[in-house]
Amino acid sequence: MRCLALDIGGTKIAAAIVKNGEIEQRQQIHTPRENVVEGMHQALGKLLADYEGQFDYVAVASTGIINNGILSALNPKNLGGLAEFPLKASIAKHTDKPIGLLNDAQAATYAEYQLQNFEQVSNFVFITVSTGVGGGIVLNQILQTGSRGIAGHIGHTLADPNGAICGCGRRGCVEAIASGRAIEAVSSQWEDPCDPKEVFERFRKNDEKATALVERSAKAIANLIADLVISLDIQKIAIGGSVGLAEGYLSLVEKYLQDFPSIYCCEIETAKFGQDAGLIGAAYWVKDVLLDKPEGTIYG
């Protein structure tokens, strides 16, 4: 079956035909920044028209939270005016094909899970450490989306009760300590300010301030991993994102994990899918859950 997959982010919307995990006819446009509600309706309509007659179903991976087809977020400001956008209904105006939607990190998780040996790994987590910290959880070979679509927002678990206020409004979330945004919040205040990319360059040169900042991030992720393993019996975790894949970061996370009792540890690997993880994961998930198992529940 051929899927029209859409990946809706804060700055771009990617679209492609996905068949058997392979990307075809990929295109990318800017997410509307002005008149955003009408602009999004128009953008979706154009993309559906571009691929008319070429797909059997639609799969959407989107930033934010998808609940009953409505787009929202823990921090609505991140959506730039698209909070409570009727995403599924907007797409349904242009096609009568089946439509499934889920969060982009959940979709990426499902893509990464397709590379695992299902018999050996039934409990799996994907963590993306980038501008923010997000992820997804697979338990008993089933991707967890939750009754409200929020399952997997692991970046908003507690890392430091005395830490910085997170964008979600809570104090001390993992995201407020480990993310690229959190790193930049500190490094931009230095006498010699820099962005996260340069922080890592300085870290690799053993700069004291940069090393302390990167270590702080890696410790938060190591503790997050330990919490996930001990609470959910996770067998393997894949780490991605611009921070998570930065040279030297994963080995630092693993170093801190070695300080814990072994029961808190599991196998860690780098994420294999790149920018198309959301497209591929959404296509697989909608096919597996909505089309191949019609008795299953679709959130989104």
UniProtKB/Swiss-Prot annotation:
Taxonomic superkingdom: Bacteria
Pathway in which the depicted protein is active: Amino-sugar metabolism; N-acetylneuraminate degradation; D-fructose 6-phosphate from N-acetylneuraminate: step 2/5
Record-linked InterPro entries: ATPase_NBD, ManNAc_kinase_bac, ROK, ROK_cs
CDD domains reported for this sequence: ASKHA_NBD_ROK_EcNanK-like (cd24069)
Sorted UniProt keywords: ATP-binding, Carbohydrate metabolism, Kinase, Metal-binding, Nucleotide-binding, Transferase, Zinc
Cell inner membrane listed as a keyword: no
BP terms from Gene Ontology: N-acetylneuraminate catabolic process
GO MF annotations in UniProt: ATP binding; N-acylmannosamine kinase activity; zinc ion binding
Binding residue positions for Zn(2+): 156, 166, 168, 173
E.C. code: 2.7.1.60
Pfam families, A to Z: ROK
Residues engaged in binding ATP: 5-12, 132-139
Record's catalysed reaction(s): an N-acyl-D-mannosamine + ATP = an N-acyl-D-mannosamine 6-phosphate + ADP + H(+)
Family: Belongs to the ROK (NagC/XylR) family. NanK subfamily.
HAMAP family in the cross-refs: ManNAc_kinase (MF_01234)
Function as written in the Swiss-Prot or TrEMBL entry: Catalyzes the phosphorylation of N-acetylmannosamine (ManNAc) to ManNAc-6-P.
NCBIfam families attached to this UniProt entry: PRK05082.1
Subunit and interaction comment: Homodimer.
Name this protein carries in UniProt: N-acetylmannosamine kinase
